[in-house]
Amino acid sequence: YAEGFQLLSQTGGTLAQPENIGYFTESKHYKLAEPPGYKVVYNLLQLAPTANNQYLLGFSSANRFVGKFYLSADTVKVVMDIENLEMAAGATWQLEDFFMEQGNNRNNLLNNFATVIEKNHPRLKIPFPRGWSSWAAFGPHVTAKNIYNNLAEIKKKFPTLKYVQIDDGYQANMGDWLTVGKSFDGGIKEVLLKIKEEGFEPGIWVAPFICDTNSTIYKEHKDWLVKDSVGNPLRSDKVGFGGWRLAPWYVLDGTNPGVQKHFEQLFATMRKEWKCSYFKLDANYWGAIHGATYYRKGATRTEAYRDGMKAIVKGAGKGAYILGCNQPMWPSLGLITGARTSMDIDVDFESMQHTGLENLYRCWQNNKLWWNDPDCLLLSGKLPENQYLFHASLLYATGGALLSGDDITSLPANRLAILKKMVKAQGVTAEFDSDKFNYGWINNHSKKQLVVLNWGKDAKTFHIPIKKPCTLINYFTGEKIGSFDKEIVLKDFAGQDGCVYDVQ
């Protein structure tokens, strides 16, 4: 297994035959260069010649440079990308720290790696986040009525869903985040203040590092944008992916003092005047775009991104929940409180499985580097009940932020019952038996739980070893499953099903 530079890229398989886990790879989608004959991965590389002989190699800091691995069938090259910077005679550069450890337990290796990273990049801490987001249910066409109706249901039935977050669509242009468009009849501030008045924390979607050509930022502040090799504003589609809407995007330069001041003022305004304490930052990858030149001479793309993020963190203020989405993974260390760990999820079982796998490979990061955000819990639609339980159980196992993404007013009683159990999650991650992710244990002080996932279509029997006798209770229904002495045997566990059990 190996990480990507940005959120949407992960790699599995073998050295000879690497397999893309994420849909959007660095080489094809973002057009990051690969030397002939090698697969390039980033940040973390896990090798398992046998189950009891495993290696973890990784970069445990990300202050200036990007760490890479070049892979072929018989070679692993450890690479530090210095971005063609010229090193003056007599100068010294501090490279990034490197970690390597061998062992027989995958979870222990990952936990040790996380501990070293956290020493280099202390995390921004907030309590376990629970909330609701408008995007999955309503997209960019969300209305004030949609928000108010769900707010009323949340207040009545799910008051622990503290954050109520409005997503993309409110802004006039990409880049002009305080100039609202036609949505909410131009009154998004009033909606946010209403959320606060009802006792909840307003959240907002922002893509701070990008702008489109219709924006005031682009028209009046071209000096704020990163430049190409001849000094013109860099069109992102000339070096990589140009953006998913209103493209091509241009990129704000995090090393520019004007941009830093703009970021600080923007987020301070949203915190103090709009009362937002939850900031969903999207398109963060562009803040570390390759092929750019910066205001500060000699700056790397990691430094440009981190300089910008430091200004955002300062403006957002103490206790803010800062969620990174479409983010460069390691450059975000210590500068976000939450990290998206998968592609967007849909009410579709293939999507639930695929994003679930992406999330489970990153479980080790949760509550160590940041709070993982496995995307929304989705319980609407017409899927079979077992598939919703697979999805809910998997999200519960990640220990990541719990964000409902449905129009809660339209959920049937059986789905509301699942949501009522999910909001009680405590942010504790399951440790799985292997990277097959068939079953995992959650140890939350004196409370122990077991998560079981059947990824296949057919029913199967699970044999799970235990160290002492126990009784299993279905967490979602309260039903007693049985008592077990030496191993837990779950017969005919339905295909594409999942469950969380209380272990007594």
Kindly label every feature range from the protein language model.
Residues 39-41, 395-398, 403, 433-468, ...:
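Carbohydrate-binding surface patches
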Residues 90, 132, 164, 195, ...:
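Conserved, mostly hydrophobic/aromatic
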